[in-house]
Amino acid sequence: MANPDETCPFCTIASTYAPYPPTSPPPPTSSLLSPDLTAPETHLILSTPDVVAFLDIMPLSPAHLLLCPRPHAQKLSDVPPAPAEALGRYLPVVSRALVRVLGEGTDWNVVQNNGVGAGQVVGHVHFHVIPRLKDRGAAGGPMEERFRKSFAMFGKGPREELGDEEGREMAALLRGAVAEVLQQEAKL
């Protein structure tokens, strides 16, 4: 990996987990996917030579995942060409995988912040892919609902730590769905 930042949690993930063929991911019990190689656990979805995807440790909803380039880049304008191309390639793939796992009719946001002033918390480019579940209603009226949706869209709102067992199960489902999506694309 080019220019890893030893203090960056996403560089740690990118340097810990080796790439594997996304059409045939290792079994969940494989040491290649061991979530406890990092602390907190990493629930890997995808690991290619250029990008990694994993579940957010403080998800806004089930299956909230992050897709990031393997090399360290603080802002989208800093991402080298090959990882940038891979980000564009795999955003639709992980989106389709998410729909396969959560069901047709699932809505989702794709959010990417550039810099602290834009709300970026980890200084390594990453795209949030956030499913929007239909049963997350607001306690109040239309204004509260509008405010809640606006807040949640930009990564704020109710968040809980991802449970390790829940993370392992969801990551396995999403890895399988990514493989299915890519296998289906290969037939087209």
Model-derived regions, located:
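Short connector loops at helix/strand junctions that flank enzyme active sites
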Residues: 46-48, 60-62, 82, 89-91, ...
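Conserved His + Asp/Glu catalytic blocks
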Residues: 2-7, 132-188
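Short histidine-centered catalytic/ligand-binding loop motif
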Residues: 65-88, 154-163
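A short, aromatic/hydrophobic, helix- or strand-capping loop or linear motif
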Residues: 22, 38, 101-107
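A short glycine-rich, hydrophobically flanked beta-strand micro-motif that places a catalytic Asp/Glu
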Residues: 102-118
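Active-site microenvironments that recognize anionic phosphate/pyrophosphate groups
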Residues: 1-71, 168, 172-188
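Histidine-centered divalent-metal-coordination microenvironment in nucleic-acid enzymes
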Residues: 115-138
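Long, well-ordered alpha-helical scaffolding segments within enzyme catalytic domains
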Residues: 82-101, 164-173
